[in-house]
């Protein structure tokens, strides 16, 4: 069948060895890893973290295509052609990024402890699955220099404007 899936890219922490084994019997599986939780039964393994050497992939995977290192970071096109960021001597603009959900309410904790008056602008970007967005935003309605956003497009604009960013893990750190 010409519409049959030939390859599948998997990027999830929820996978199990059994799941990947089952998929690998049906299609060519490409797995993005950064935890090295177990030996992944896949055709191709990508680890774009600079720490890939500590996982000893080359010794463990003799029959798997390996793509290791930061040259394989899946950056969005907008980040590939950015001009170099000019670093200011003083931090005036802050950027907080929670990732998708912020289960541990880190944004709330950061904002609570932060000396908010020290900064000209504070951008707070919540992931689209962050349930406490309206509650958090309403707590800072009296602060004109604190701006809240949810599920933004063009993240690169916020990053270029920021003098300092605090981020959840993931690809955002490379961006």
Residue ranges and their predicted role:
Residues 33, 47, 98, 126-128, ...:
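Short beta-strand/turn micro-motifs composed of small residues
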Residues 89-162:
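Donor-nucleotide binding loops and adjacent catalytic segments primarily
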Residues 42-103:
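A nucleotide-sugar donor-handling region in carbohydrate enzymes
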Residues 160-171:
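Acidic donor-binding loop of glycosyltransferase active sites
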Residues 1-61, 66:
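Active-site and donor-binding regions of nucleotide-sugar-utilizing enzymes
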Residues 9, 30, 44-46, 123, ...:
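Hydrophobic/aromatic beta-strand patches that form the interior of the parallel beta-sheet core
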Residues 20, 107, 111, 173-174:
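Generic hydrophobic/aromatic pocket-lining and core-packing "Φ" positions
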């Amino acid at each position: 069948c010409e519409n049959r899936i030939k390859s599948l890219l998997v990027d999830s922490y929820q996978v199990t060895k059994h799941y990947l084994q089952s998929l690998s019997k049906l299609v060519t599986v490409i797995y993005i890893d950064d935890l090295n939780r177990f030996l992944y039964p896949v055709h191709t393994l990508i680890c774009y973290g600079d720490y890939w050497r500590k996982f000893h992939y080359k010794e463990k995977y003799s029959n798997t295509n390996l793509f290791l290192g930061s040259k394989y970071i899946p950056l969005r096109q907008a980040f590939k052609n950015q001009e170099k960021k000019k670093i200011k001597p003083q931090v005036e603009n802050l950027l907080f990024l929670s990732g998708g959900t912020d289960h541990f309410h880190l944004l709330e904790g950061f904002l609570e402890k932060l000396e908010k008056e020290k900064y000209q602008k504070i951008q707070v970007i919540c992931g689209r699955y962050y349930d406490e967005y309206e509650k958090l935003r309403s707590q800072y309605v009296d602060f004109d220099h604190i701006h809240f956003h949810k599920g933004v497009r063009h993240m690169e604009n916020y990053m270029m404007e920021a003098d300092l960013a605090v981020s959840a893990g993931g690809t955002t750190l490379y961006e």
